[in-house]
Design a protein with these regions (language model features):
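N-terminal binding-site loop/beta-alpha segment at the start of enzyme catalytic domains
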Residues: 1-69, 270-273
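Acidic (Asp/Glu)-rich catalytic clusters
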Residues: 7-8, 56-68, 90-99, 148-150, ...
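Acidic-and-aromatic substrate-binding clefts and catalytic sites of carbohydrate-active enzymes
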Residues: 24-26, 46-54, 78-83, 111-114, ...
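Short, acidic/polar
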Residues: 24-36, 81-96, 140, 144, ...
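Short acidic capping loops at alpha-helix termini that bridge into adjacent secondary structure
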Residues: 65-69, 99-104, 132-133, 209-210, ...
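Glycine/small-residue-rich loop that forms an oxyanion/phosphate-binding "nest" at active or ligand-binding sites
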Residues: 74, 78-119, 123
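Beta/alpha (TIM)-barrel catalytic core signal, keyed to glycine-rich beta->alpha loops juxtaposed to Asp/Glu
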Residues: 109-273
Length: 273
């Protein structure tokens, strides 16, 4: 069976996380509790999601010890100034009800703030023990290299799925031993109707979502954080950890990247690779 964790600079991270974007209120609390009870040990949230209080409640409701869980959150670029980074992080820790985050990311590039200032502030939080590791999100390859030259960037969270090639970003991640965390691994559901994934899934008595995730998780330094709206979907996604694709199957899925479908491209996004 494929490994359920990856090792980045000697630190083990669960490959498959539970994403909480657009999950708020009681739904956030219940879905996080359910995910942890199913066996997830990696939870992803963000200040911008407006659900950190409920995510923290779900963690406590699950009974899973904090030290068994990888917990990631993100600072919004409006808070990229040094004082704001610390203020945001302290509020996030309080809302989540934890003493330390495993990983804190800058959610998007902040063009009006020197990157060195933001990374130095994140590094200070790391030095003070408030976060274990620091990272970035939605950074194209050139910006990731710049960040990695300034600080020990642990992860870059970006959109990545079988319809979107991220070779340049992956290359930069490999150069600097940076984890790539894939969000929107199903391309907002578009992948789930793909005939190639359906054919491969049938051969393994699996589902297209499991094939999509297995393809990602087989790649070096890649983790994924799918969102799921039901217990059944969360369990289904977790089943991807037991699926191993043949090399020809992996290549067939990878060939779909020529579509270059990007689903997250707001007006403030950087120039992509």
């Amino acid at each position: 069976m494929p490994a359920s964790t990856l090792t980045v600079r000697g630190i083990e991270v669960p490959k498959l996380g539970y994403g909480t974007w657009q999950v708020t209120g009681e739904a956030a609390r219940e879905s996080v509790r359910d995910a942890l009870e199913l066996g997830y040990r990696h939870i992803d949230t963000a200040r911008m999601y407006g659900n950190e209080v409920e995510v923290g409640e779900g963690i406590r409701d699950s009974g899973v010890p904090r030290d068994e869980l990888w917990l990631t959150s993100k600072v919004w670029p409006d808070d990229a100034r040094a004082d704001d980074v610390r203020r945001s992080a302290e509020r996030q820790l309080a809302d989540l009800g934890v003493e330390r985050l495993d990983l804190l990311l800058l959610h998007w590039p902040a063009p009006g703030v020197p990157l060195a200032e933001t990374l130095e502030a994140l590094g200070a939080l790391r030095g003070d023990g408030l976060i274990r590791e620091l990272g970035v999100s939605n950074f194209p390859s050139a910006m990731l290299r710049e960040a990695a030259a300034l600080a020990p960037v642990f992860a870059n969270q970006v959109e990545y799925h079988a319809y979107l090639a991220q070779d340049a970003v992956l290359g930069a991640c490999h150069e600097h031993s940076v984890m790539l965390t894939a969000y929107s691994p199903f391309a907002h559901g578009r992948l789930l109707d793909d005939p190639v994934l359906a054919e491969i899934a049938a051969a393994h008595e699996a589902t297209p979502s499991q094939v999509a995730l297995a393809w990602l998780l087989e790649q070096e330094l890649v983790s994924a954080i799918p969102k799921a709206s039901s217990h059944e979907r969360r369990a289904e996604n977790l089943g991807a950890l037991g699926l191993e694709l043949g090399s020809d199957e992996h290549d067939r899925v990878g060939a779909l990247r020529s579509r270059h479908l990007r689903t997250a491209d707001p007006g403030f996004a950087p120039a992509w690779d």
